[in-house]
């Protein structure tokens, strides 16, 4: 019996299945399945999954869009990716050194602004294959993701209250 998600489905199954058959989508589905098929689910960390997925997909150049407050972690991630054969472009949220007043005239903060649009432009210009998002603020992550022109995945979500582990 087919599940109906509480009978609230508003999409066409035939069209969705056809989308999965498109080469760019089917390659991702197959690479993702390799990470969990044959009893592998739960055996790899998220970082290990990303490395294996990127290798399977043939990605060579990875982007790292990170919060400057997580620079220590970003450096460790970059090192791990390089050791695993990837070229890495790491871009801090403070790229460009924009003043807060240039980005948000309603803010009372008088420091360098986060610049997710600049991060996206930098990574797009460097033509990375896959971007890992690390600790970008809510809202800024939306702007970043909306502007990236390549595949991307979130490695770390920012959650200041629960030490970046929101669940």
State where each predicted segment sits.
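Active-site glycine-rich loop that binds ribose-phosphate moieties when present
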Residues: 45, 111-125, 136-138
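Long, charge-dense
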Residues: 73-121
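Electropositive, gly/pro-rich neighborhoods at or near active sites that engage anionic ligands
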Residues: 1-61, 68-69
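Short, flexible loop segments at the rims of nucleotide/cofactor-binding pockets, characterized by
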Residues: 39-42, 107-112, 130-131
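Gly/Ser/Thr-rich loops at beta-strand to alpha-helix junctions
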Residues: 40-44, 66-74, 134-142
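Short glycine-rich or small-residue beta-strand-to-loop segments that form or flank ligand, phosphate
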Residues: 58-66, 90-92, 131-133
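Short, flexible loop segments at boundaries between secondary-structure elements
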Residues: 149-167
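Short Gly/Thr/Asp-enriched flexible loops that form oxyanion-binding sites at enzyme active sites
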Residues: 73-80, 141-150
């Amino acid at each position: 019996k087919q599940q109906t998600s509480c009978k609230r489905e508003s999409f066409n199954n035939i069209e969705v299945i056809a989308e999965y058959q498109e080469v760019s989508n089917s390659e991702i589905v197959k690479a993702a399945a390799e990470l969990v098929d044959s009893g592998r689910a739960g055996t790899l960390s998220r970082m290990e999954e990303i490395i294996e997925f990127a290798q399977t997909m043939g990605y060579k150049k990875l982007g790292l869009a990170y919060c400057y407050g997580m620079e220590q972690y970003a450096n460790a991630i970059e090192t791990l990716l390089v050791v695993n054969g990837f070229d890495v472009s790491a871009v801090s949220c403070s790229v460009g050194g924009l003043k807060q007043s240039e980005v948000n005239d309603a803010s009372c903060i008088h420091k360098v602004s986060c610049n997710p649009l600049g991060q996206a432009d930098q990574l797009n210009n460097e033509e990375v294959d896959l971007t890992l998002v690390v600790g970008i603020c809510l809202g800024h992550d939306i702007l970043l993701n909306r502007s990236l022109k390549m595949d991307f995945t979130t490695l770390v979500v920012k959650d200041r209250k629960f030490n970046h582990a929101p669940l």
